[in-house]
Amino acid sequence: MLSPKRTKFRKQQRGRMTGVASRGNSIHFGDYALQALEPAWITARQIEAGRRAMTRYIRRGGKIWIRIFPDKPVTMRPAETRMGSGKGSPEYWVAVVKPGRIMYEIAGVTEEVAREAMRLAAYKMPIKTRFLVRNQEEQQQEG
């Protein structure tokens, strides 16, 4: 599973997920992409589950790029612990995803295979997503 090798601080504040993604919202590497339509925290486990589903479906053909990285630690208190005595310890990592963010890209396969692989990955995500094609995405931005 993905997680940072080292961070400057062990714990982070929760923050807010307002607005749309200003970066990482266009296809850069592959021919097809999976784009987020809602804001959410995507856990490292969910990212890995999506990657596995896609890899298993496309088998040996094609290449997959994961465009999000879980760099935010989420802390949790032990069960049945009284209030106070500081913040809990980091339990897992999440990627903050805003609407418009490209999560996965794929190349080297046909559109039907890519669409099905992305559909399998989308089932693993806790948000609504959409399938993008590189040349169609460029036409939408112009028009």
Swiss-Prot record:
Listed GO MF terms: rRNA binding; structural constituent of ribosome; tRNA binding
BP-aspect Gene Ontology terms: translation
One Gene Ontology cellular component annotation held by this UniProt entry: cytosolic large ribosomal subunit
CDD domains: Ribosomal_L16_L10e
Presence of the UniProt keyword tRNA-binding in the record: yes
A Pfam family recorded for this sequence: Ribosomal_L16
Chain's role: Binds 23S rRNA and is also seen to make contacts with the A and possibly P site tRNAs.
HAMAP family in UniProt: Ribosomal_uL16
Quaternary structure and interacting proteins, as annotated: Part of the 50S ribosomal subunit.
Protein name per its UniProtKB record: Large ribosomal subunit protein uL16
Species classification: Bacteria, Bacillati, Cyanobacteriota, Cyanophyceae, Acaryochloridales
